[in-house]
Each structure stands twice: as structure tokens, then as C-alpha cells.
């Protein structure tokens, strides 16, 4: 199931879910996992709205942290909460939905909250590092959308550099495309012709590298997405 989720093969994920439902225990942790994954799959398949997705994730979070909202935008916001991995994945799902509906301030708060918790050392170092680099890339998206291009690039590059230094291949293509996207936005808004050309060249190079990595991994989703971007922005046929 996790492999199909990482490859965005959500129709196959749905089939796995049907089998898992028959075998899963009645523990809170298992029910929370099932609720999160089912909501994600239904949302990505277009079967529920972003608001319904958020509501289901909120219900999943409340299974283990009833007052979780107070740590995000309530009176406990300044306090670092020791989130478990499953709770972080639920928050990341909320981040996806808030970005999609344009609630970018909430999106940023969620990713910053996750990163602070991961930096606090509550989780084992390897898992925390892998989750952090993904959330750095996630944080770059709303920052870029709000025109905070340099901040977005810094976060995206921090995540990519972490992945490279640790030999973390799983999210490498997405991280590279995040950096390439930030450079594209900087180029588009730059009045410095030399920098504009430099950022475009770096973006093109990174997209091409990401394409070949996706192709080697038989990652058809990202391969198609990158090919479309290269064709649209640079007129390249891959």
C-alpha cells in the first residue's frame, strides 16, 4: 500500500485498502491510519472535496490529540508538541488541502509546526530527517505562491541538500522539481538579465536531471509531469 501511495497509483491503493479493512485491528492507531489513508486516496481520486478531506483528517487527528488545533493556531501555538509520525502525515495531508484551496497562511503554519517538532528530537533521527526534508520542500510551495521567492528557494535547497547528503532517493525527484520551480519564479520576476538567464539555465538543468532519475525509477507520473514542464517552459521534447 505505501509503495502505491508513494507512486501516486491511487486506484491501486484503493484496491489494497479494501483488503486491509478486513484485517486491520480496532486499535486507535490502526483506525487513525486507515482513516488518513482512505481520505487521501479518495481526495486524490477526486471522490471528495478539499473541505471534506480536511474534515476527515481533522477527525483522524482528534483520535489521538483532541485539542490539536490549539497547537496550530490556538493558545498553545508557541509550544512544541511531540507529534508521532502518523500525526505528522495527517498534518501533511491538511497542508496539501489548504494549499489547494488557497489558505496559504494555514499551509505555512502547518509545515513550520511540523519542522519545529522534528527539530526538537522527539522522533528517531533518521525518520525525523526524512520527514523534515519533505516538509522543507512542502513549505517552499506556499512561500513561492505568496511571492516570497528567496525564502522558498532557501527552504527547497535545504531539503534537497539534506536528501543528497543522506543518500535519500525516495523524494529526490520532487525535491529537485521544487528547487527548479523556485528558480523559475525568481527568473520570471527578476529585473537583472544576467540573473534571469542564470536561474533559467539552472532550472532547465535540474528539470532534465530530475526527468532522467524519474525515468530510471520508472516513475511515470513524475516523468510525464517533468516532460510537460520542459516542453512548456523550454520547448524541449523528452
Residue positions per predicted region:
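Tandem amphipathic alpha-helical repeat scaffolds
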Residues: 2-8, 33-47, 86-103, 131-145, ...
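TPR-repeat structural position
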Residues: 10-11, 48-50, 104, 149, ...
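Amphipathic alpha-helical segments of tetratricopeptide repeats
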Residues: 14-24, 57-69, 75-77, 112-124, ...
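Structural signature of alpha-solenoid helical repeat junctions
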Residues: 30, 79-86, 106, 124-131, ...
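Hydrophobic alpha-helical segments and helix pairs
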Residues: 36-37, 41-81
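Aromatic-anchored, glycine/proline-accented short structural segments
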Residues: 91-163
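C-terminal non-catalytic interaction modules
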Residues: 188-238
Amino acid at each position: 500500500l505505501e509503495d502505491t501511495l508513494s507512486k501516486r497509483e491511487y486506484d491501486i491503493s484503493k484496491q489494497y485498502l479494501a483488503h486491509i479493512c478486513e484485517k486491520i485491528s480496532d486499535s486507535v492507531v490502526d483506525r487513525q491510519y486507515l482513516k488518513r489513508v482512505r481520505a487521501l486516496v479518495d481526495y486524490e481520486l477526486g471522490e471528495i472535496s478539499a473541505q471534506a478531506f480536511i474534515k476527515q483528517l481533522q477527525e483522524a487527528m482528534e483520535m489521538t490529540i483532541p485539542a490539536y488545533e490549539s497547537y496550530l493556531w490556538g493558545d498553545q501555538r508557541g509550544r512544541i508538541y511531540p507529534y508521532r509520525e502518523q500525526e505528522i502525515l495527517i498534518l501533511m495531508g491538511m497542508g496539501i488541502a489548504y494549499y489547494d484551496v488557497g489558505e496559504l497562511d494555514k499551509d505555512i503554519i502547518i509545515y513550520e509546526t511540523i519542522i519545529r517538532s522534528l527539530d526538537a528530537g522527539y522522533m528517531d533521527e533518521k525518520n525525523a530527517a526524512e520527514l523534515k526534508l519533505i516538509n522543507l520542500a512542502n513549505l517552499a510551495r506556499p512561500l513561492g505562491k505568496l511571492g516570497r521567492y528567496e525564502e522558498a528557494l532557501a527552504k527547497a535547497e535545504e531539503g534537497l541538500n539534506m536528501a543528497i547528503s543522506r543518500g535519500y532517493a525516495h523524494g529526490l525527484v520532487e525535491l529537485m522539481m521544487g528547487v527548479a520551480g523556485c528558480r523559475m519564479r525568481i527568473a520570471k520576476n527578476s529585473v537583472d538579465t544576467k540573473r534571469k538567464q542564470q536561474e533559467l539555465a539552472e532550472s532547465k538543468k535540474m528539470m532534465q536531471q530530475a526527468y532522467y532519475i524519474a525515468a530510471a525509477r520508472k516513475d511515470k507520473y513524475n516523468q510525464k509531469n517533468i516532460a510537460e514542464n520542459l516542453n512548456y517552459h523550454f520547448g524541449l521534447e523528452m
